[in-house]
Amino acid sequence: MSHVHQAGEAFASSPAESRQEIRNYTMNFGPQHPAAHGVLRLILEMDGETIMRADPHVGLLHRGTEKLAESKPFNQSIGYMDRLDYVSMMCNEHAYVRSIETLMGIEAPERAQYIRTLFDEITRILNHLMWLGSNALDLGAMAVMLYAFREREELMDCYEAVSGARMHAAYYRPGGVYRDLPDHMPKYKESRWHKGKALKNLNAAREGSLLDFLENFTNEFPGRVDEYETLLTDNRIWKQRTVGIGVVTPELAHQWGMTGVMLRGSGIAWDLRKKRPYAKYDAVDFDIPLGKEGDCYDRYLVRIAEMRESNRIIKQCVAWLKANPGPVMVKNFKVAPPKREDMKDDMEALIHHFKLFSEGYCVPAGETYAAVEAPKGEFGCYLVSDGANKPFRVHLRAPGFAHLSSIDSIVRGHMLADVVAMIGTYDLVFGEVDR
C-alpha cells in the first residue's frame, strides 16, 4: 500500500501534469439542427454544459434582395418583399408600398386602408401561431403545434381568397390593394378524409363572403387561444424551460435596437401602431400587451395577448368593411392598372396594362423611410429614388437581425438546452435576417 501511495505522490508532483488545465471546447449548433429554424449556425464556446460565448454565423440564406430591387421597376419588387419574412408576408409588402406612396404623394382609399389593417392583423396571428407551434415543438410539446396549425389553415384560406396564393400574396399595391374582398370563400372538396356530414360541417362557415367567414372566426378564436393557454401557460415543464431564461433587461433591449415583442416583453410600451399610427390603426381600439421580467415566458405571454388584441382589431375592421363599400385603388392611372373588363374591349387599356407591368412608372426623386409594426418588430424600408422607374437604393430594416445580434450577450451563463428556448422566443426567420 505504501508503494502505491508513493507512486501517487510522484504522479501528482510531475511538472508536466501540474500545468494541465481544463479548456473550453467549441460546438456547432446548426445549421442542420431542427431548432435552428432553417439556416442559423451558432458556434458555442462551452464549459461543460454551460455556454461561455455564442458566435452567430448568418448569410446562408442571403439572396441579394436589396440589390435585385435596384434592377426592377418599383411595382415588380413587391413579390420580393413576400419572400423576406416568409411568415409575415403582407406586413413586408406594407412597408415597401408605403415608401413608394410617400415619394409619389398618393394615399390609398379609406376602404383599402381598412383592408390593409385587417390583413396586417391576420398576418400577425398567422405569424404568432407559427411561432407558438414551432417553439412548443422545439421544447417537446407536440400537441400545441397541431392545435395552432388548425387555425392557421383557416387564415391561410383568407390569403388564398383575396390573392390566389396561400403565402406569397403580392396583394398590396401602391395606391391600394389588388382587388376588393371576395364574396365567396374556398371550400373543402370531398375526399377520402372529408365526406358527408363532416364535409358539410367544415364548409358551414364558408357559405358566405370572406367577411362573414372572418366574423365567424373572430367569435371562435378566443376559445381556441384559451386551449393553447390550457396546454402551456400553467404547464410545469413549460415554465421550467422558459421562466427566468433569456432575460432581456430594458436597458439591453434599447442598446441592441430591439423592437416588437422583444421590447414589449421587457416592459417597454413601444408599438408603431400606437406611437406612429399608419393605415387605420388610429381608428381602431386595442391595447399594447407588456411583460415584466423580459424572459422567455413573458415573451410567450405577450404573443398570446397580442393574438387576442389582433382578434379585436379584425372584428372592428370587419364591421366597418361590411358597412362601407367603396374603391380599393386610388384614381391615379399612373399607378392604377385598368380593369380586366376594360381590357377585353379597349385596346388602349390593354396597352396601358402592358406598359404598367413591363416598364412600371417613374417615382419622383427623393428619399423616405416607411416602417410598420410587423409581427417580429419594426420592419422598415428606406427607399431612394433618382426619378427613374427603378429604385436607386432600397434598404430593408429587418427586426430579426438586431435581435440575433444580441444572442451572445443573452445566452452567456445558460445551459445548452436553454439555447433552443431562447432562439424560439426570438422568433427568427432568416429570409429577413439574411435578405
UniProtKB/Swiss-Prot annotation:
How does the entry describe its membrane topology? Peripheral membrane protein
Q: Could you give a GO molecular-function term held by this entry?
A: NADH:ubiquinone reductase (non-electrogenic) activity
One GO location term (cellular component): plasma membrane
EC number, as in UniProt: 7.1.1.-
InterPro entries xrefs: NADH_Q_OxRdtase_suD, NADH_UbQ_OxRdtase_49kDa_CS, NDH1_su_D/H, NiFe-Hase_large
Major site of localization recorded for this protein: membrane
Print the keywords alphabetically. Answer: Cell inner membrane, Cell membrane, Membrane, NAD, Quinone, Translocase, Transport, Ubiquinone
**What PANTHER family does the record tag this protein with?**
NADH DEHYDROGENASE [UBIQUINONE] IRON-SULFUR PROTEIN 2, MITOCHONDRIAL, NADH-UBIQUINONE OXIDOREDUCTASE 49 KDA SUBUNIT
Name-wise, this protein is NADH-quinone oxidoreductase subunit D 2
Which organism's genome codes for this protein?
Stenotrophomonas maltophilia (strain R551-3)
